[in-house]
Amino acid sequence: TNPFFVTLEGAIREVVESHGDQLISMDPANDSNTQVNQIEDMISRGVEVMFVNPVDADGIIPALDMLKDAGIPMFGFDTQVGDMSYLTSYAGSDNYNAGYVCGEDLAKKVPDGGDILVLDSPTMQSVTDRTNGFLDAIKESGVTFNVVGQQDAQGNQQVANEKATDLL
């Protein structure tokens, strides 16, 4: 379980419950089909509002159509959806810039360059944006870095550790 989402869920739960409401939280385990099924289930349970962090920015669109048809307002966080017009509101960071700042920092700290292994999660738009920002920054830095591999870590630290170990 991602510590970011554990903290975020706790904060949302605290606010929701302080108003006498109930928060139902589901983990799609980085599976877009599971997430769509979970949203269908929430609609059938009669939820009044939906907080959405898509596994796949475009893969979630059918579920957003269902939410829209059901008249359920949608609030996005952290990762944008493929069509932001579905959302009532969105709160998230500038993931591209966050990656760019990391790339700039690496170039300053490792001025001789080196080999880099990128562990990403291509279906997660927030991760893709951070990766692109990072790669653009190191390219523009003038420092020579070689991307020797790029693997899908599926947004999972254990998978990332295993892939890094295998590739090293």
Question: What is each stretch, according to the model?
Answer:
Residues T1-L168:
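A residue-level marker of the well-folded mature domains of exported/periplasmic proteins
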